[in-house]
């Protein structure tokens, strides 16, 4: 039986957002990120801090997944994960990564390329302490990216960890920590009519950031 044809033209909304004058955009990409991120937090219905994280093995085989931004500033963009997961292994073996934020409500994207380094233990401990207790226990229960025979096994392991830490604070697992992405390239993309999109590229140099524009 033939699959129904998808009319992809109908998937695209014709709604437009107010025009941004690229000439008026900040020359500081981190300040511009702050501005766009603030708008996304106000307009996105779910997970405005969600970002795609692309990693690769040393021989160039890529993998991609969504993670949550948990900190950002002049020193980079921070996320947390299980260090023994697939992405944890790839990050340890190949520090070159890419991030992508896509905010549908604003019809904007931000692409970031750079390299990662682990956060220090104090930073990881401080963030872990802000997580809900069940999320903390979940970090102990999950052997992320390892084969799992059934959901029941996972739930039993979670219950086991609940019992283990009953009546006490849950410490951060040694295999769970954070990574900081130091950006080298940041591209801001804004949707425009007739696919005449605006692309503004910042590249880091030894003395700061350069700013330029790209054809869409």
Curated annotation (Swiss-Prot):
Pfam families: PNP_phzG_C, PNPOx_N. It catalyses: pyridoxamine 5'-phosphate + O2 + H2O = pyridoxal 5'-phosphate + H2O2 + NH4(+); pyridoxine 5'-phosphate + O2 = pyridoxal 5'-phosphate + H2O2. It comes from the Bacteria. Its EC number is 1.4.3.5. Binds 1 FMN per subunit. Its cofactor is FMN. Substrate binds at residues 70, 127, 131, 135, 195-197. It is an enzyme of class 1 (oxidoreductase). FMN binds at residues 65-70, 80-81, 86-87, 109, 144-145, 189, 199. InterPro entries: Pyridox_Oxase, Pyridox_Oxase_CS, Pyridox_Oxase_N, Pyridoxamine_oxidase_dimer_C, Split_barrel_FMN-bd. One of its GO terms (molecular function) is FMN binding. Keywords: Flavoprotein, FMN, Oxidoreductase, Pyridoxine biosynthesis. Pathway: Cofactor metabolism; pyridoxal 5'-phosphate salvage; pyridoxal 5'-phosphate from pyridoxamine 5'-phosphate: step 1/1; Cofactor metabolism; pyridoxal 5'-phosphate salvage; pyridoxal 5'-phosphate from pyridoxine 5'-phosphate: step 1/1. One of its GO terms (biological process) is pyridoxine biosynthetic process. Belongs to the pyridoxamine 5'-phosphate oxidase family. Homodimer. Catalyzes the oxidation of either pyridoxine 5'-phosphate (PNP) or pyridoxamine 5'-phosphate (PMP) into pyridoxal 5'-phosphate (PLP). This is Pyridoxine/pyridoxamine 5'-phosphate oxidase. It comes from Sphingopyxis alaskensis (strain DSM 13593 / LMG 18877 / RB2256).
